[in-house]
A protein has these predicted regions:
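Serine-dependent carboxylesterase/thioesterase catalytic core
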Residues: 58, 80, 84-234
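C-terminal motif of bacterial Sec signal peptides marking the signal peptidase cleavage site
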Residues: 54-56
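Bacterial N-terminal signal peptides that target proteins for export
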Residues: 33-44
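Bacterial lipoprotein signal-peptidase II cleavage site
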Residues: 59-63
Length: 299
């Protein structure tokens, strides 16, 4: 690895990947090629900037070590504003539940925390961030084939996740996706995104989330630039004009509406209620761990 200032920036991401590759690859040459590719890839810069911007390099690096990378990958995205509180709470819950995969907080925001409207309205910039996420997943799967990959997107971050799925190569699939209070048009055709998911896409929505997912997106628009209530309020509606192939993709969609029994888990039905550590521990982790006991897996 380079010893320059650039190396200091890249090492939190390159180091764990190279170390893990060394233990799994047949020879040193493959490791050297891996490191060189990551030096040249601007994806690395995007990943490390995301790691350092809010959470701090050490915090994200703690969940991106070689052992975790060898288990699998969970990528979590916050909503507009770039504070990344929700992904940190979710990460804590997943870790408490025994998830040993790498857990990466992908910071897709447009600058200083609090740029809510910029994050929401810049569709071209958001799609560029989504392409970066898609390439990140594809690079991970290239060097860790067969490991499980899960994507979690809350609110605006759910839009980035859907855009990323749509931007993936035709042969790329992730294992599962969680769209928590998605700030997307409820009539959006999800079939192109669903085609890149091997198992299921889980959607959570709440009729109590009316301020942000109702009034907010009706006024300022959804991530896909429709001025309407969002799927985070009412869920996704299945289009009526689907082809047979697209209709088969919709068999992967699982939608869970907020219910009063979630109160015992600290979920009051508000916008941030889907991002608590308790929700991650009780509802998301069982699916990531391959234990389909989570109520949302039966939706």
């Amino acid at each position: 690895l380079p010893s320059s200032g650039e190396g200091d920036i890249l090492s939190p991401v390159i180091g764990p990947i190279a170390s893990a590759a060394e233990s799994h690859a047949p020879g040193k040459r493959r490791v050297e090629k891996l490191v060189m590719r990551y030096r040249l890839s601007r994806l690395v810069v995007a990943l490390v900037v995301a790691a350092c911007a809010v959470s701090g390099c050490a915090t994200n690096a703690q969940y991106m070590g070689a052992e975790r990378l060898a288990h699998g990958l969970v990528v979590s995205l916050d909503g507009v504003g770039g504070y990344n509180w929700g992904p940190q709470w979710l990460r804590d819950g997943l870790n408490q539940a025994g998830v040993r995969s790498a857990i990466y907080i992908f910071d897709w925001g447009h600058g200083p925390a609090g740029m809510f409207l910029a994050d929401l309205m810049d569709e071209s910039g958001n799609r560029e961030q989504a392409r970066e996420l898609a390439r990140m997943v594809e690079n991970y799967q290239r060097y860790y084939p067969g490991r499980p990959v899960y994507l979690i997107g809350h609110s605006g971050g759910a839009g980035i996740v859907v855009f990323a799925l749509e931007a993936m190569k035709s042969t790329t699939q992730v294992d599962g996706v969680f769209l928590l209070a998605p700030a997307l048009d409820p009539d959006r055709n999800l079939a192109p995104a669903l085609a890149h998911v091997r198992q299921n896409v889980y959607v959570t929505h709440s009729p109590a989330d009316v301020a942000l997912m109702g009034l907010g997106t009706s006024t300022f628009g959804t991530m896909d630039r429709k001025h309407t209530v969002s799927a985070g309020l009412v869920g996704f509606r299945i289009p009526t004009n689907l082809s047979a192939a697209d209709a088969r993709q919709y068999a992967k969609l699982r939608q869970a509406e907020w219910k009063p029994d979630l109160l015992s888990k600290g979920n009051l039905g508000g916008h941030m209620s889907w991002t608590t550590s308790a929700f991650a521990r009780e509802y998301i982790a069982p699916i990531v761990l391959g234990r389909p006991a989570s109520p949302i897996s039966q939706a």
